[in-house]
Amino acid sequence: MPVKGFKPYSPGRRQMTVSTFEEITKTTPERSLLAPLKSKAGRNNQGKLTVRHQGGGHKRKYRLIDFKRNKDSVPAKVASIEYDPNRSANIALLHYLDGHKAYILAPNGLQVGQMVVSGPDADIKVGNALPIKNIPVGTLLHNIEMKPGKGAQLVRSAGGSAQLMAKEGKYATLRLPSGEMRMVHIDCRATIGQVGNLEHENINIGKAGRSRWLGIRPTVRGAVMNPNDHPHGGGEGRNPIGRNPVTPWGKPALGAKTRKKKHPSNRFIVKRRGKK
């Protein structure tokens, strides 16, 4: 969706950009596919803070998205393209010919009235979902499973696409948006095409309050805290850190690697992602 700016009639409007929502065809969601979504504000089931800088924001309902795409050989008509406040991509409402309704991630180029289908015999067409073993090498994919039948976990955000690079034995090699080359089982399902809403990356928040609408709270630097609040804090005026950068709890930060050296999925990674 194209992005529009504003005349600078206030400091907050000067840099702000918003989506024009031209692709959105329906503004009220399908009630049968909504679920309540309680605000966690970064707390776990014990009420303890586990993720900082979260809280507040507009109240939301969760849209139940079909990430498995396992309703085989039943064609579905795209009834509408809708906004989803819980993700960067838009979603498409499908009406299956047997009366079932479902939401899927809206791929780039998907139009209202278009027919999509899932299953091993599906055509290589945008919006269709099928096992990777039935997809030709070089195809752009999104909504990719990591384990057969578990549901899609990879390449789900706006504008994302992976390319099928090779198929050998039981595994296929994908090039992910990060540049990582990764193997997945050929029985895993993927959807043809690129995730829509390509211009999402060009949106400028513009002002602090808009971040608060999204449930994002301020990030305070440790250097401006008191020494009892952060290892970087204290001192008269501005000071260098004076030690290796650390988190509020004293663990290495700012470039320290956090991935486990013996992560179970290491054997599926052919090439690590490059530095940005």
Swiss-Prot record:
GO terms for biological process: cytoplasmic translation. The keyword Lipid metabolism does not apply. It comes from the Bacteria. Keywords: Ribonucleoprotein, Ribosomal protein, RNA-binding, rRNA-binding. GO terms for molecular function: rRNA binding; structural constituent of ribosome; transferase activity. Residues 225-276 are annotated as: Disordered. Residues 257-276 have a biased composition (Basic residues). One of the primary rRNA binding proteins. Required for association of the 30S and 50S subunits to form the 70S ribosome, for tRNA binding and peptide bond formation. It has been suggested to have peptidyltransferase activity; this is somewhat controversial. Makes several contacts with the 16S rRNA in the 70S ribosome. This is Large ribosomal subunit protein uL2. It comes from Desulfitobacterium hafniense (strain Y51). The lineage of its organism: Bacteria, Bacillati, Bacillota, Clostridia, Eubacteriales. The gene is rplB.
